[in-house]
Design a protein with these regions (language model features):
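Non-catalytic, solvent-exposed segments at the cell envelope interface
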Residues: 2-247
Length: 247
């Protein structure tokens, strides 16, 4: 059989070499993507460890809850309640607290509540308002005051006012809207211990349990006084009743 000298001969190793080259390319791309993903997460405001102190300060023992409940004449539910504290700040000043919303997901009763806490008030026996302690101590100041009032916090999300509005709109429209609004939500988040998937999961669970912008529960305040004058106070037991840790 005649073989043309100008046509290259096929090598038995040619396919093996090609496969090896492709494998190297895929591995290189995978390593690059992994590296970029790691860098993005390291510098991300989501899944941040900067809020670890705030969450650690929000731990409440069953005994503390029982003491507050006994003093108020109510009963601890014993339910497993996951509380996410959404600290809302001014769009133009992240150091100014303009709102505090607690999303309480009761896994035992399979229900949820969204509780709005007045930031110009003090919780329980606190000596300063929530807005004041945020200005001086950040998120930890707020969670510490809540914990002192027997209100545990599992997660903390600091958002701007526009970010909170986007979150509520998306949560009310369902899971698909949450995914579509990812960019708007991310832009409105200042800091969160939850990563993107965790935040999405909270939104979906809250929405499926019936939480919406129309279902926000307000906590009543009462006027109290000390040596410095009068102030507004949130009763710890009333707040616990609202989130479901007491009944």
């Amino acid at each position: 059989m005649y073989e043309r000298p100008d046509v290259p001969k096929l090598s038995a190793n040619r396919n093996v070499i090609a496969a090896a080259v492709i494998a190297v390319v895929f591995v290189s791309v995978a390593l690059l993507v992994t590296h970029l993903w790691r860098l993005a997460n390291e510098h991300s405001k989501l899944g941040s460890s900067k809020l670890s102190d705030a969450i650690a300060a929000a731990t409440v023992s069953p005994d503390a809850i029982a003491q507050v409940a006994e003093a108020a004449g109510v009963t601890p539910t014993g339910d497993t309640v996951e509380v996410v504290a959404f600290l809302v700040t001014a769009d133009d000043d992240e150091k100014t607290l303009t709102g505090l919303n607690l999303a309480a997901i009761d896994d035992t009763q399979e229900k949820a509540a969204l509780v709005s806490v007045p930031i110009d008030a003090r919780v329980g026996t606190a000596t300063a308002s929530l807005a004041s302690v945020y200005a001086s101590g950040g998120a930890k100041g707020v969670t510490s005051q809540l914990a002192a009032g027997a209100v545990p916090v599992s997660h903390v999300v600091v958002m701007t006012e526009s970010g909170w509005g986007a979150f509520m709109e998306a949560a009310q429209s369902g899971a698909s809207a949450l995914k579509r609004s990812a960019t708007r939500l991310l832009d409105g988040i200042v800091l969160s211990d939850l990563d993107a998937q965790g935040l999405l999961d909270i939104g979906q669970r809250a929405a499926s349990a019936g939480i919406s912008a129309d279902s926000v529960v307000g906590v009543p305040t009462a006027e109290a006084s000390d040596a410095a004058g009068t102030y507004q106070q949130v009763d710890s037991a009333q707040l616990a009743l609202a989130i479901g840790t007491m009944a």
